[in-house]
Amino acid sequence: MFLEVETHCHTIASGHAYNNLEEMVLEAQKKGLKGICITDHGPEMPGSCSSLYFYNLIVVPRKINGIMVFRGCEANIVDYEGRIDIPEDALKRLDFVIASLHDVCIPSGTVSDHTRALIGAIKNPYIHCIGHPGNPLYEIDKEEVVLAAKEYKKAIEINNSSFYVREKSKENCIEILKLCKKYGVYIAMGSDAHYKADIGRCEITQKLVCEYEFPPELIVNKSLESFISFLKLHGKDIDI
């Protein structure tokens, strides 16, 4: 299965990634993608950019070298109520917002704490996707989170990078994938690229999706059209 839209990648603005925005877009073009979401880390991530960066992303052209560019963010969840580190005035100007738990932004708590945090983020109308929920550092009630995503029509990310950098993520991701299939919940397949060579790299995620016969119509970034249709569910009217 080939993905047409990269939904999760970082530029040098995140502070610990290694290419600029244009380099990431050009790499997406080389790999035959049709769209890319630039999702730099929110300001609570040490070394990342300020909220002004996200507010001003609107100056980035919608297309660069024929590739659709979606203005996004990987917001940090900063408390167990699911609050994030991006102000509303910036969120309103973004196309696609991922919310994630990161250990440098919020300590690990209980399963109940983590579950409440993710569900709180899911309820935020400006958030479209939950990032790497398979992280074993933040164990969750997976069924509760998946059911909340279904209720609010949000996507759950199956993060390919997790299989390399977050030990024991695979078992959690498989369980989440099965639950999303069971309940008809959207997923996004993201590389979480911090270097241009990893753009569109979702080989393990794609293998699991095929192995567990996940419905293609629930993969939001399977095609450019499916991604834009998903965004329209959340009030984003973007023309191809």
Swiss-Prot record:
<feature type="binding site">
    <location>
        <position position="8"/>
    </location>
    <ligand>
        <name>Zn(2+) 1</name>
    </ligand>
</feature>
<protein>
    <recommendedName>
        <fullName>Probable phosphatase Athe_0620</fullName>
        <ecNumber>3.1.3.-</ecNumber>
    </recommendedName>
</protein>
<feature type="binding site">
    <location>
        <position position="192"/>
    </location>
    <ligand>
        <name>Zn(2+) 1</name>
    </ligand>
</feature>
<feature type="binding site">
    <location>
        <position position="74"/>
    </location>
    <ligand>
        <name>Zn(2+) 1</name>
    </ligand>
</feature>
<comment type="similarity">
    <text>Belongs to the PHP family.</text>
</comment>
<dbReference type="InterPro" id="IPR003141">
    <property type="entry name" value="Pol/His_phosphatase_N"/>
</dbReference>
<dbReference type="GO" id="GO:0008270">
    <property type="term" value="F:zinc ion binding"/>
</dbReference>
<feature type="binding site">
    <location>
        <position position="132"/>
    </location>
    <ligand>
        <name>Zn(2+) 3</name>
    </ligand>
</feature>
<feature type="binding site">
    <location>
        <position position="16"/>
    </location>
    <ligand>
        <name>Zn(2+) 2</name>
    </ligand>
</feature>
<dbReference type="GO" id="GO:0042578">
    <property type="term" value="F:phosphoric ester hydrolase activity"/>
</dbReference>
<dbReference type="InterPro" id="IPR004013">
    <property type="entry name" value="PHP_dom"/>
</dbReference>
<keyword id="KW-0378">Hydrolase</keyword>
<dbReference type="Pfam" id="PF02811">
    <property type="entry name" value="PHP"/>
</dbReference>
<keyword id="KW-0862">Zinc</keyword>
<feature type="binding site">
    <location>
        <position position="74"/>
    </location>
    <ligand>
        <name>Zn(2+) 3</name>
    </ligand>
</feature>
<dbReference type="GO" id="GO:0005829">
    <property type="term" value="C:cytosol"/>
</dbReference>
<feature type="binding site">
    <location>
        <position position="102"/>
    </location>
    <ligand>
        <name>Zn(2+) 3</name>
    </ligand>
</feature>
<keyword id="KW-0479">Metal-binding</keyword>
<dbReference type="InterPro" id="IPR016195">
    <property type="entry name" value="Pol/histidinol_Pase-like"/>
</dbReference>
<feature type="binding site">
    <location>
        <position position="194"/>
    </location>
    <ligand>
        <name>Zn(2+) 2</name>
    </ligand>
</feature>
<dbReference type="InterPro" id="IPR023710">
    <property type="entry name" value="Phosphatase_YcdX_put"/>
</dbReference>
<dbReference type="InterPro" id="IPR050243">
    <property type="entry name" value="PHP_phosphatase"/>
</dbReference>
<feature type="binding site">
    <location>
        <position position="41"/>
    </location>
    <ligand>
        <name>Zn(2+) 2</name>
    </ligand>
</feature>
<feature type="binding site">
    <location>
        <position position="10"/>
    </location>
    <ligand>
        <name>Zn(2+) 1</name>
    </ligand>
</feature>
